[in-house]
Every structure is written in structure tokens, then in C-alpha cells.
Regions:
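Non-catalytic C-terminal interaction segments of nucleic acid-processing enzymes
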Residues: 1-41, 152-292
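Feature targets compositionally biased, intrinsically disordered low-complexity regions
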Residues: 10, 48, 146-147, 221
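An N-terminal, globular interaction/scaffold subdomain
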Residues: 12-83
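Short amphipathic alpha-helical surface micro-motifs
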Residues: 44-46, 106-111, 174-175, 201-202
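Active-site metal-binding core of divalent-cation-utilizing nuclease and nuclease-like domains
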Residues: 64-66, 76-138
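Short N-terminal secondary-structure initiator segments
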Residues: 72-107, 206, 215-239
Length: 292
């Protein structure tokens, strides 16, 4: 694997310097159906055109727009939401209000089923989860954009750049499930969540249910490199179906460790504060409980 974090820049692998790839970079274009022809990530006038970064031997999708390749995510979500042969379309960035008419956030895509007169029959909500980045990825990006020929194989050691799966779960995925997810569940509407396989692997395992009984479909994708064209292609790795409550609990509730470990840690800190030469043994859990 390269010794720099840049997997894809403006839609193409960093070592792809073909005329097509260079045209996208020169014009700062997005090949994956952004709301505008150009990339608008981070700054509209100076976009951070990094679609994905290396994560060890894998590639992590960091831009949610990257998932729009070939519109596979829309097709896969529709298959979960609606029966076969249903007439449907997708709408982007739809505001969702709560019972107090306050915004609970925008839904990335709402897929709408309709009859032959254009009247809504049903709908489902599709959320797309990119991954936060820890470290400064703009610096290697700018270095690459200034001299792509010499920087495509650069060794980048100035900053450590990596996907931040924990923050992505706590700051993005969990709030979306809590606020928007609860409203949609109360309405009896299905939800689909799109994630990269690396992100999904960091989540707790979910109790599975049959597709027909599920509230949520977790659509898990990866990137496959085509060596002939030197381009990555989005592929669905698997789909997992869950009930809403079970999924929410697994995402928002922490894994609870033993009390003894925390008490031992407290004892170490207390020993440091008191400056004891001979620290007492940490009390057992049974001793603590018997004194209460």
C-alpha cells in the first residue's frame, strides 16, 4: 500500500494520472453525482477532493457523496422499502420536523412510491454515513495537487491521517437514529443506512430479523479496484436487517466493563495523589458492596 493516506482524489486513485482523471482534478469535478458538477467538500471555492483514504490494507470512504456511484444505494434501498414493480423515485435532502415543528435534521434521500396519478403510496428514508477523518488530510492533499507526478508515490509522515470510526458513530450515526429514526419508527416507515464495511465492522453486532419484519436495513459497501481501468467501483458486501429498538440500543448504549477495573484505576490515582510509598491493595468488589 502507498505510504500516504490518499486513496481517491476527485474520484480517481492517486496514482491514476490518465487524461480523464486529470480533467476532473483540473476542474475540481465530482464524478459521483454531487449536488453541483464540482466538488464542494469542506470549501466550495477550495474543495477537499478526497473521496476515500487508506486504512491499513483497506480503503475507507470518507465522503458520503462517494456512495452515489451508479446509484446502487438507491436501488438497494428501494428493494427493501417497496414490493417489486412499484413505481418510485427519490428526493434529496428532505427536512424532517418533530412534533414541535422543530427540525430533527434533513434526510439524505426519501424514496417515494406513487400510483399512476402521482399520489404518494408509501415512502422510506435512506441515510448515508461517511466517516470522519482524524488528522489533517488537507496537507497531503495540497501537496499532491501541487505536484501529482512526484507526489503520487510520496511518503507522508508529517501528520497521521486515519478514519475516526468512534466519532463517526457517536457524533453522526447515533444522533440520527435517536432523532430522525424515532420519528420514522413512530410513523411505521422503514429506514436504510448506508455504511462502508470498515465502519460497520466497528459497530456492535445487531440481532438479526427477517427482511419483511425489519425496521432498518444496514447496507454495507466496499470499494473494489479494477486494475484495468485503475478505478475503484462500489460494491454491496452484505445487507443486515434489524428491528429499530435493538439497533438503537446497540449503537447508543456502551459496553459495560467490570466495576473492579474502575476501582483499581481509582486506587492508582488516589495513591498518586496521597504519595504513599506502599499502596494498599485495591478493595474487592464484595468488600465495597458490603460496606454500603
Amino acid at each position: 500500500m502507498p505510504n500516504h493516506p490518499l486513496a481517491e482524489v476527485f474520484g480517481f486513485p492517486a496514482d491514476n494520472l490518465s487524461p480523464e482523471a486529470e480533467r476532473y482534478r483540473l476542474n475540481r469535478l465530482c464524478p459521483y453525482h454531487n449536488k453541483a458538477p464540482s466538488c464542494t467538500k469542506d470549501k466550495a471555492k477550495d474543495p477537499l477532493g478526497v473521496c476515500s483514504i487508506f486504512d491499513g490494507a483497506s480503503v475507507a470512504i470518507t465522503c458520503p457523496v462517494r456512495f452515489r456511484q451508479d446509484w446502487l444505494i438507491i436501488e438497494d434501498a428501494a428493494r427493501f422499502f417497496f414490493p417489486a414493480n412499484t413505481s418510485w423515485t427519490s428526493l434529496q435532502e428532505i427536512r424532517l420536523n418533530d412534533g414541535n415543528n422543530q427540525s430533527a435534521g434533513n434526510i439524505d434521500f426519501v424514496l417515494v412510491a406513487y400510483d399512476d396519478r402521482g399520489r404518494i403510496l408509501d415512502f422510506g428514508a435512506l441515510e448515508v454515513q461517511g466517516v470522519y477523518i482524524s488528522g489533517n488530510v488537507r496537507r497531503p492533499f495540497e501537496c499532491y495537487m501541487e505536484d501529482r507526478l512526484n507526489c503520487k508515490d510520496m511518503q507522508w509522515t508529517s501528520t497521521r491521517v486515519a478514519p475516526d470510526y468512534l466519532s463517526s458513530s457517536r457524533k453522526r450515526l447515533a444522533p440520527q437514529l435517536i432523532y430522525k429514526g424515532n420519528i420514522l419508527k413512530a410513523w411505521g416507515k422503514k429506514q436504510a443506512v448506508v455504511l462502508h464495511e470498515g465502519f460497520f465492522s466497528t459497530l456492535p453486532s445487531f440481532p438479526q430479523t427477517a427482511p419483511a419484519e425489519a425496521d432498518i436495513a444496514w447496507l454495507v459497501y466496499g470499494l473494489e479496484l479494477d486494475a484495468t481501468t485503475n478505478r475503484y467501483h462500489l460494491q454491496r458486501r452484505r445487507t443486515e436487517y434489524t428491528a429499530f429498538g435493538a439497533a438503537l440500543d446497540r449503537v447508543i448504549l456502551p459496553s459495560i466493563g467490570p466495576l473492579e477495573t474502575f476501582v483499581s484505576h481509582l486506587q492508582d490515582k488516589l495513591d498518586e495523589k496521597l504519595g504513599e510509598d506502599h499502596a494498599p491493595d485495591a478493595p474487592a468488589l464484595g468488600d465495597i458492596l458490603s460496606e454500603e
